[in-house]
Structure formats: structure tokens, C-alpha cells
Regions:
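Flexible glycan-contacting loops in extracellular carbohydrate-active proteins
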Residues: 225-261
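Solvent-exposed strand-to-loop "edge" motifs in beta-rich extracellular domains
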Residues: 39-41, 125-135, 150, 206-208
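A carbohydrate-recognition surface predominantly in extracellular/luminal proteins
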Residues: 33, 81-82, 86, 101-145, ...
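Extracytoplasmic low-complexity segments
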Residues: 1-98, 276-291
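Short surface loop/edge beta-strand patches of beta-sandwich-type extracellular domains
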Residues: 19-27, 89-124, 188-192
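Localized edge beta-strand/strand-to-loop motifs within extracellular or lumenal beta-rich domains
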Residues: 193-217
Length: 291
């Protein structure tokens, strides 16, 4: 007969690897501040129900849950593993809004990890863009990732957007003060508009190596750019809220982001990781989820 003893304590081998909800978190030294994914049942618990204001996108890192905001009931739904802004293929151009909004605690944490030009972070987004034939050539900026505050009006943090005009470039701007910023726009490797047309795209904006840089990747194209030295920040962006989707900070038409799948924010000062190496490994693990 065996002996069974019940203890009121638990014992564990601290040398065993920690099992995380998502491999993106493995080895992050607790530096990932947010990881959300509409194809993950823990993160998005709404199934295929119509997304509405106030719905929660739970943080897989279990720190900073996000909420859906600014939705105008313009046909948004859940499809292909992501939040679909335009099931009819037209609504992005009708001034529809809708974002995944992170709490200000994310911006505040990044702000407090370094001095005025030492905020090291990586922001990653997976999205699908509409066919470039739908995009127009006006001069507006269509933000799909960035602060809820416009860089030219207040204490914003970051912006990534389609810079329209005839070129259809990617515009990345790190706010350094009202109406001043580090700018790193795409002008090489082919036009952003053409490269991401009707494509599932991973975009990484980061300050690894103390430069403002970006990299976008599709199944057929990988383009990197930026590399500008970080300029001193003269305002406090810690109260701003990071948004993914169709923002109102810079929300001119067209709005070419069709689907939003997966988002992450990482404090590189804490994690010490190379964001591009992390992004490449993540792409290989998760890209098959999205359509």
C-alpha cells in the first residue's frame, strides 16, 4: 500500500523553464508590456460576434488589457483570424473609425525606463491592407498605429501611417515635442503601397540600437528603413494611449487597413532582445493563423 501525504504548500524546481501563454513571451525578462491577438482564445473572447465599443482584447502577457474604441458600426466583424474593418471592401474610405486602444500605463512604462532620448521599445503589428487599386493619391496621413494624440497638437508618442500623395509611402514619426519629431519614411525597396497591396503584413517600429527604425514583411517582400539617431524628447507622452486601427488622431481617407490581427509592445530596456530576431521567429510561428 502506498502512502499519500497532503501538504498545504507547493514545491517547484526553479530551474525548470517557465511555460508562457505565447512563445513571443519566452525569454522576454518580463519586458513585453502588451500582446494581443484576435486569433487567440485567451486574448479575444468575443468569438465571431460583432466588435463593439468597450469590448476587451485581453493582454496575453497579463499586464495591460486593451479595449475597442471609436467604433461606428460600419460593418466591422471578426474574420480570418482578425478584426475586419471592411467586409464590403469599401468602408475604410467612408471615414469609419475603430481602434484597439492600450491603456496609458503602457506609454508611462516606456517613458519611465530611460532619459529624454533613451526610451527603447519595439511595437509590432500584423495587419492586412486592401488592394492598392483602392488607394487614392491625396496628401492626407492615414494613421494605423500610433498615439491617440496627434503629434502636431499635443504630447504624443509615436505614429505609423500611410503617407499618401502619389508615392504611397510608409511614414513613421517619433514625437519629440509639439510639431517636432524624428521621421523615418519609406523611400527605398519599392513603394509601401505596392508592396503591401492585398497582403498580410508584419510591421515593426523600434528604437533598438538608439535609432528610430522600422521593418515591414510580407510573404514575398521584406523592407527595412530608418536608422536616424534619436533626438531628445522635450515633452511627457506618458499619458498618451497607443492605438492600432483606424484612429482619429490622423484619420484622413483612404483608410487602407482591412484587417488587424496581432499587436505587441515591448520595453527593450527591460528585455534586452533584438526586436527583428524576435519578429522573425514570431512570424514563422503565427503567420498561418491569418487570412
Amino acid at each position: 500500500m502506498g502512502l499519500i501525504t497532503k501538504l498545504n504548500e507547493s514545491f517547484g524546481d526553479t530551474t525548470l523553464p517557465q511555460i508562457r501563454r505565447d512563445d513571443f513571451l519566452s525569454g522576454d525578462n518580463n519586458g513585453v508590456l502588451f500582446l494581443g491577438d484576435f486569433s487567440d482564445a485567451f486574448s479575444w473572447r468575443g468569438g465571431t460576434s460583432t466588435p463593439t465599443n468597450g469590448a476587451v482584447l485581453y493582454d496575453i502577457a497579463e499586464k495591460n488589457d486593451a479595449v475597442l474604441a471609436l467604433f461606428t458600426n460600419d460593418g466591422e466583424n471578426i474574420a480570418g483570424g482578425g478584426l475586419d474593418f471592411a467586409p464590403d471592401g469599401v468602408s475604410p474610405y467612408s471615414a469609419a473609425t475603430g481602434v484597439v486602444e492600450l491603456p496609458a500605463a503602457v506609454s508611462s512604462t516606456i517613458w519611465n525606463t530611460g532619459g529624454t532620448n533613451e526610451h527603447n521599445y519595439a511595437i509590432t503589428m500584423y495587419g492586412k491592407f486592401l488592394d492598392a487599386s483602392w488607394w487614392d493619391s491625396d496628401a492626407s496621413i492615414e494613421q494605423f498605429m500610433g498615439s491617440n494624440i496627434a503629434y502636431n497638437t499635443g504630447d504624443a508618442w509615436i505614429l505609423a501611417a500611410l503617407q499618401s500623395g502619389t508615392n504611397g509611402d510608409l511614414s513613421v514619426r517619433r514625437d519629440t515635442g509639439t510639431s517636432s519629431q524624428n521621421s523615418a519614411s519609406s523611400a527605398t525597396g519599392g513603394r509601401f503601397k505596392d508592396n503591401v497591396s492585398n497582403a498580410i503584413t508584419q510591421l515593426v517600429v523600434h528604437t533598438y540600437g538608439d535609432t528610430l527604425s522600422w521593418r515591414y514583411k510580407t510573404a514575398t517582400t521584406t523592407v527595412s528603413g530608418g536608422g536616424a539617431a534619436l533626438q531628445t524628447i522635450t515633452h511627457d507622452y506618458s499619458s498618451s494611449k497607443l492605438q492600432f486601427g483606424h484612429s482619429t488622431a490622423f484619420g484622413g481617407d483612404p483608410r487602407p487597413l482591412k484587417r488587424l490581427y496581432r499587436m505587441a509592445v515591448e520595453d527593450l530596456t527591460t528585455s534586452g532582445r533584438d526586436p527583428i530576431a524576435v519578429a522573425d521567429a514570431d512570424w514563422n510561428r503565427v503567420i498561418s493563423r491569418f487570412s
